């Protein structure tokens, strides 16, 4: 299964074949690629922290969109790349807060995460923002508020909701999307 389909879809398809040689290899390879893709935002975060000289544990991360997908609307958390990112950041000691257009604060707390009470204030306080689903409300978030602190901030746009050039034009913002990160320093 290509794209961000639920992991169960390719696994159910594979289990429906009785002969091991008849297993749908392509769907299983796609599943592996999807699992690896959910680590990409974390690799960007690590590279960003290294390049700007900020210890990972000192960072405040705002993860926007922990539902599996934003459109059509759902509060389904199964297979959520947003959850993968949030939990991995927490394991690194990063202060993580969550906002989702559909998932309730109670559901966020039940998932072991901290919901934001004021989205605008959370954006201002964040050192990095991870946009992890394509809910239409996510594209109306004012990421330019991130530049209110004196150091460079990271915007990971997992769904291409923002114009890269416009975001990069905001002083102090580093834009990243799957396969791209604003050049900061030579590696």
At which residue positions do the language-model features occur?
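Structural/interface elements that position substrates and couple domains in central-metabolism enzymes
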Residues: 1-187
């Amino acid at each position: 299964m290509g794209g961000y389909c639920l992991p169960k879809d390719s696994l159910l398809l594979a289990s429906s074949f009785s002969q091991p040689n008849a297993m749908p290899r392509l769907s299983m390879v796609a599943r592996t690629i999807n699992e690896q893709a959910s680590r990409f935002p974390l690799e960007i975060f690590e590279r960003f922290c290294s390049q700007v000289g900020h210890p990972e544990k000192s960072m405040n991360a705002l993860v926007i969109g922990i539902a599996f997908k934003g459109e059509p609307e759902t509060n389904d958390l199964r297979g959520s790349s947003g959850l993968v990112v949030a939990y991995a950041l927490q394991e690194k000691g990063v202060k993580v807060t969550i906002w989702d257009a559909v998932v309730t604060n109670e559901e966020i707390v039940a998932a072991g995460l901290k919901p934001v009470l004021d989205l605008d204030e959370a954006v201002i306080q964040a050192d990095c923002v991870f946009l992890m689903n394509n809910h239409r409300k996510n594209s109306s978030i004012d990421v330019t508020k991130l530049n209110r602190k004196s150091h460079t901030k990271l915007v990971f746009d997992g769904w291409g909701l923002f114009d890269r050039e416009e975001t990069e034009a905001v002083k102090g913002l580093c834009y990243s999307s799957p396969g791209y990160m604003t050049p900061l320093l030579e590696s």
